[in-house]
């Protein structure tokens, strides 16, 4: 995924001066307007850098050496990159790109306290998305540590609060809905990487063999065949969790996200990470992966 670093920022500055030189050579060019646009781009980059610095300071309150904390730190920056990649492929304006990055940076801020208190990612221990929104936008207004401008408070709050909802509902504002969908896609996209790179013990508390020994619950398989995400409460065995990680990709909003997933061959790689003890389980995993890839290709082809 595309990462923007100090060299990219230097390039923006360089381009700014090239543009200035160009418009100065032609009196008919609106050089003031172009310079304002370039300055705005630099301001947006600085805004994200300031938010990132504040986030790093916030992380100092937690044990970075803890495997689950480390996972979520890496995941956070993975979601930032994923949000930017999706947004740029969609052709969104720079303000929306930077806004998507900030939401990605803060989307899981509630996870760190959940891990500190419960050493768990389970939704039954804490609704981390709701908690994160309350933490940022409650009486103390922690959001001001990260974002000085309050124009997007409602949008950011809603996107964070709803990013882990089973179904995205109840948003009427068009731009807020865009970013709520975008963070959900970016979150799922980086979770593909997480499921391949993190140790299975950190993810599910057992090794790959232990995951593959289970039987897929009937309700879980029904959801998979209905092309729906799996309810957390329906999962019984570790293999239920694993198959649910693939089924959740039916709930992707933008074809650009599917394009990235196909480029990385994520679905097959996630399926193949686990050795399934029962032929029936292997067969069902193969069926789901094939159906998922067919669905993804159709969405990409139809661009919707």
Model feature map: region roles:
Residues 19-37:
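Short, Lys/Arg-enriched N-terminal segments with co-localized hydrophobic residues
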Residues 78-86, 127-140:
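An active-site-proximal "capping" alpha-helix that borders the catalytic cofactor pocket
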Residues 52-78, 110-122:
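Active-site flanking loop/helix segments enriched in acidic
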Residues 97-124, 132, 136, 155-166:
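His-Asp-centered metal-binding catalytic motifs of divalent-metal-dependent phosphohydrolases/nucleases
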Residues 91-102, 142-161, 175-182:
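Acidic/histidine metal-binding catalytic segments
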Residues 4, 14-17, 24:
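Low-complexity, intrinsically disordered or signal/transmembrane-proximal segments
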Residues 39-46, 68-73, 77, 81, ...:
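Divalent metal-dependent phosphate-bond-processing catalytic cores, especially two-metal-ion Mg2+/Mn2+ enzymes
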């Amino acid at each position: 995924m595309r990462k923007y670093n100090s060299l990219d920022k230097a390039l923006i500055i360089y381009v700014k001066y090239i543009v200035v030189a160009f418009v100065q050579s032609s009196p008919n060019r609106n050089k003031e307007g172009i310079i304002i646009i370039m300055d705005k781009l630099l301001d947006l980059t600085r805004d994200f850098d300031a938010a990132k610095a504040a986030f790093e300071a916030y992380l100092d309150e937690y044990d970075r050496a803890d495997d689950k904390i480390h996972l979520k730190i890496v995941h956070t920056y993975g979601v930032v990159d994923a949000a930017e990649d999706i947004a740029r492929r969609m052709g969104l304006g720079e303000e929306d790109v930077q806004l998507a990055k900030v939401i990605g940076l803060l989307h899981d801020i509630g996870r760190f306290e959940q891990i500190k208190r419960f050493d768990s990612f389970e939704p039954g221990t804490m609704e981390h998305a709701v908690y994160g929104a309350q933490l940022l936008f409650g009486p103390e207004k922690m959001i001001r540590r990260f974002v000085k401008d309050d124009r997007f408070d409602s949008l950011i709050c809603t996107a964070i609060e709803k990013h882990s909802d089973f179904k995205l509902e109840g948003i009427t504002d068009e731009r807020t809905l865009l970013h709520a969908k975008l963070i959900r896609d970016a979150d799922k996209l980086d979770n593909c990487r997480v499921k391949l790179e993190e140790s299975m013990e950190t993810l599910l508390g057992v090794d790959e063999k232990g995951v593959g020994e289970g039987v897929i619950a009937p309700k879980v398989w029904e959801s998979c065949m209905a092309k729906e995400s799996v309810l957390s409460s329906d999962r019984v065995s570790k293999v239920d969790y694993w198959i649910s990680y693939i089924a959740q990709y039916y709930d992707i909003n933008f074809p650009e996200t599917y394009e990235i997933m196909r480029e990385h061959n994520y679905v097959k790689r996630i399926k193949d990470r686990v050795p399934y003890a029962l032929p029936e389980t292997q067969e069902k995993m193969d069926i789901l992966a094939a159906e998922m890839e067919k669905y993804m290709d159709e969405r990409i082809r139809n661009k919707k």
